């Protein structure tokens, strides 16, 4: 199945459901960052979560940033996802590998760490982002984001995230988010039913691997609650907005002396994007042009010389 996101409603609009398949984009991230198995699972889960959270935003420019800072060896995890279906992300220590846990699965909680913080920023594109922070619950990503939604956004939610990776790469990845809308959020029994049903999807990646589609999984979860799956699926993909233009603009921050050293000692500059591992090379000629631009007299009017016009 192609990477995609689908939306649905149930219980007469009282339940919002979103599902996402992220197999190909998670494999692309694995290849770009040369991720270990455990790092692939962690970043894959977080990217799926980012797309699920971004799916409820309204303006086209809306984006969600998820930052996980645990005390595990994987270091920081950072994901940026948009309502437009694009996502990117990285982990600080992508090659870390750990032994399986007691039940033979990737030890995600140990890799991330269960002490630390989860930071989520929602930006609708107007310069007034909303941010929230909670302590990590388990480091498993799904538990931590569910905790955040309940505590910071007061939205009872049930979330399952999964990534299956083997020596051939990422075989399946994705997630499902069920949320109780405010008008029925006080119905604790409904919330418990959703939590129970999502818990039954502990083999979520196995279902995907066996060929189950998101609509079929939704039917199992919510088929007896007046399920209404919206007809249009949204394509999702790994996409970074880095560019050579942005790199050259960032190099201006180093100043004339440091840029001159890059020319003389390194014969240019190399910059790697953290989000996608794309390598950019700035030539001595390009650095020289930046130096010349920096040495040009500023045409801006100093703040002290600004004055109001009289009429």
Curated annotation (Swiss-Prot):
Superkingdom of the organism of origin: Bacteria
An individual GO BP term: protein refolding
CDD domains found in the cross-reference section: Hsp33 (cd00498)
Modifications made to the protein after synthesis: Under oxidizing conditions two disulfide bonds are formed involving the reactive cysteines. Under reducing conditions zinc is bound to the reactive cysteines and the protein is inactive.
GO molecular function: protein folding chaperone; unfolded protein binding
GO cellular component terms attached to this protein's record: cytoplasm
Protein's name in the database: 33 kDa chaperonin
Origin species: Trichodesmium erythraeum (strain IMS101)
């Amino acid at each position: 199945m192609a990477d995609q996101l689908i939306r649905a409603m149930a219980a007469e609009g009282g339940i919002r459901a979103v599902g996402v398949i992220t197999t190909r984009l998670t494999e692309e991230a694995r290849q770009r960052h040369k991720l270990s198995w455990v790092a692939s699972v962690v970043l894959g889960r977080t990217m799926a979560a980012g797309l699920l959270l971004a799916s409820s935003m309204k303006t086209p420019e809306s984006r969600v940033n998820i930052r996980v800072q645990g005390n595990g060896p994987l270091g920081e995890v950072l994901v940026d996802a948009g309502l437009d279906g694009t996502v990117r992300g990285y982990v600080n220590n992508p090659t870390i590998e750990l032994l399986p846990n007691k039940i033979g699965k990737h030890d995600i909680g140990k890799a991330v760490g269960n002490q630390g913080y989860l930071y989520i920023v929602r930006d609708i594109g107007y310069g007034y982002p909303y941010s929230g922070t909670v302590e990590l619950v388990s480091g498993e990503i799904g538990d931590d984001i569910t905790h955040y939604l309940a505590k910071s956004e007061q939205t009872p939610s049930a979330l399952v995230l999964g990534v299956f990776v083997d020596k051939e790469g990422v075989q399946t990845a994705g997630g499902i988010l069920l949320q109780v809308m405010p008008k029925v959020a006080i119905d604790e029994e409904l919330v418990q039913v959703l939590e129970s049903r999502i818990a039954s999807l502990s083999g979520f990646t196995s279902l995907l691997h066996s060929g189950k589609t998101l609509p079929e999984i939704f039917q199992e979860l919510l088929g007896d609650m007046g399920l209404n799956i919206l007809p249009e699926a949204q394509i999702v993909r790994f996409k970074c907005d880095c560019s050579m233009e942005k790199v050259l603009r960032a190099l201006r921050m180093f100043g004339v002396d440091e840029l001159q050293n890059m020319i003389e000692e390194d014969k240019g500059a190399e910059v790697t994007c953290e989000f996608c591992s794309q390598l950019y090379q700035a030539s001595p000629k390009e650095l020289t042009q930046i130096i010349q631009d920096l040495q040009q007299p500023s045409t801006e009017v100093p703040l002290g010389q600004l004055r109001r016009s009289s009429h």
